[in-house]
């Protein structure tokens, strides 16, 4: 793998750190870009302070939310629709994907993730 681009993604889970970029010594140049995404990375022990690839202020990271509330409907059942309390609402790039996985238009105010948000009942 020589490059990776992530746009409108949610990296979330049960751990404090759910996102890592790791380089292999002698692996060559690796280009990456993470934009308009929400990343769970709560480094409570400051274990990754000296790793430049995980400096979320560098230019490889653009318009991201760090440690936001995804507010998934039912992640234990793989239902990753986001609800009205999600920090991902209206934060995505509409140019990347004009529709969500259900075919709902997302050109005006797109949400980060695979689905536009809904109001849970």
Regions found by a protein language model. Name each.
Residues 1-79:
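Predominantly extracellular beta-rich ligand-binding scaffolds that present long acidic/polar faces
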Residues 78, 83-121:
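Surface beta-loop-beta hairpin patches that serve as ligand-binding interfaces in beta-rich domains
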């Amino acid at each position: 793998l020589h490059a990776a681009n992530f746009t409108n993604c949610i990296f979330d889970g049960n751990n404090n750190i759910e996102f890592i970029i790791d380089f292999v010594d002698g692996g060559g140049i690796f280009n990456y870009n993470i934009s308009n995404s929400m990343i769970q990375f709560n480094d409570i022990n400051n274990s990754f302070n000296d790793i430049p690839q995980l400096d979320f202020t560098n230019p490889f990271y653009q318009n991201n939310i760090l440690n936001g509330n995804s507010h998934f409907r039912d992640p234990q059942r793989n239902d990753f629709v986001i609800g009205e309390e999600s920090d991902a609402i209206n934060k995505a790039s509409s140019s990347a994907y004009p529709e969500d996985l259900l075919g709902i238009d997302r050109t005006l105010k797109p949400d980060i993730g695979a689905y536009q948000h809904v109001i849970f009942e």
